[in-house]
Amino acid sequence: MVPPEEIASASNPDIEGENILHFLCREGDITDLMAFKNVISDANRHLVLQFNRHGKQCVHIVSNPGIADPQEKLKLLMEWGADINGQERVFGNTPLHIAAYTQNHKLATWLCNQPGINMGISNYLFKTPYYVACERHDIKIMNILRAKGGQCRIYRCNEAWLFTRNY
């Protein structure tokens, strides 16, 4: 069980604007995050949705490369009320955008299989996850999104190969 003093200080962000869940999502493994499972309640559920100083919620932190157990962490965060379609404050990227930007095929596949996932959200640069995959010439993520019914229309793109290649 997590000590009460840790929960009491969990709402107090550190100098980076991060609460304890932000830290555990970035630095810990799934067992560290699971230690909070019995402690998360309606009184402190807001911690899951808090933005850090960089405009990221827990779902954005675990979607970045190099994070241990991203799918398991996302599953737990969603149980606690995290928004799988939540947009970060700086660029408006969702976890699916981040998976496309970082070419994380495993995470993109997992996200596309989640109920309620919105594959057609545009970030603040008016790019859908599919468009991001096109920019990166990532046929695999494009196919993952297309197979799950993602928005596949490209309205503007400087890459001529997108219009001449058969998929």
From Swiss-Prot:
Alphabetical keyword list: ANK repeat, Host-virus interaction, Inhibition of host NF-kappa-B by virus, Repeat
MF annotations from Gene Ontology: NF-kappaB binding
InterPro entries reported for this sequence: Ankyrin_rpt, Ankyrin_rpt-contain_sf, NF-kappa-B_inhibitor
Signal sequence annotation: none
Family according to the record: Belongs to the polydnaviridae I-Kappa-B-like protein family.
Cited function: Suppresses the host immune response through NF-kappa-B inactivation. Possesses ankyrin repeat domains required for NF-kappa-B binding but lacks the regulatory regions required for dissociation from NF-kappa-B and degradation. Therefore, prevents host NF-kappa-B release and subsequent activation.
Protein name according to UniProt: I-Kappa-B like protein I1
